[in-house]
Amino acid sequence: MGRMHSRGKGISSSALPYKRTPPSWLKISSQDVEENICKFAKKGLTPSQIGVILRDSHGIAQVNSVTGSKILRILKAHGLAPEIPEDLYHLIKKAVSIRKHLERNRKDKDSKFRLILVESRIHRLARYYKKTKKLPPVWKYESTTASTLVA
């Protein structure tokens, strides 16, 4: 799938392992993995950061193969899931930082243009998440209140 606002084609990606069973050398039980996920979520880490930590320091390549469910599902089951989906949150964070930059540098036309692109991506993602009921139907992105969503 191509990029939305650039020329890149986005071809390269990592290949998922063929075996869906946990490796034989992995001695951690699924309950231990769930406890670790909850512990990291309480520290304030995002689901992707939790996955990176589990992969790098605990040797768990795919949480789904060990526990049978994905990180976000485990977080939802324990009531620790973020209220705004992670990709939307990071786009809002980017828009807030560009807006802050534009307050200091009013003549930066390129940043103004990039802000328009980022905000259009935010609106598109929000529409998708409302359709799939991951966001409430009355949720709306407003640039004035965006900094409170990120903080």
From Swiss-Prot:
UniProt cross-references to PROSITE patterns, sorted A to Z: RIBOSOMAL_S15 (PS00362)
Recorded superkingdom: Eukaryota
Keywords: Ribonucleoprotein, Ribosomal protein
One biological process term in Gene Ontology: translation
GO molecular function: small ribosomal subunit rRNA binding; structural constituent of ribosome
GO cellular component, one term: nucleolus
Gene3D superfamilies xref list: 4.10.860.130, S15/NS1, RNA-binding
Keyword Ribosomal protein part of the UniProt annotation: yes
SUPFAM superfamilies cross-referenced by the UniProt entry: S15/NS1 RNA-binding domain (SSF47060)
Family annotation (PANTHER family): RIBOSOMAL PROTEIN S15P/S13E (PTHR11885), SMALL RIBOSOMAL SUBUNIT PROTEIN US15Y-RELATED (PTHR11885:SF25)
Similarity annotation: Belongs to the universal ribosomal protein uS15 family.
Name used for this protein in its record: Small ribosomal subunit protein uS15
Source organism (scientific name): Glycine max (Soybean)
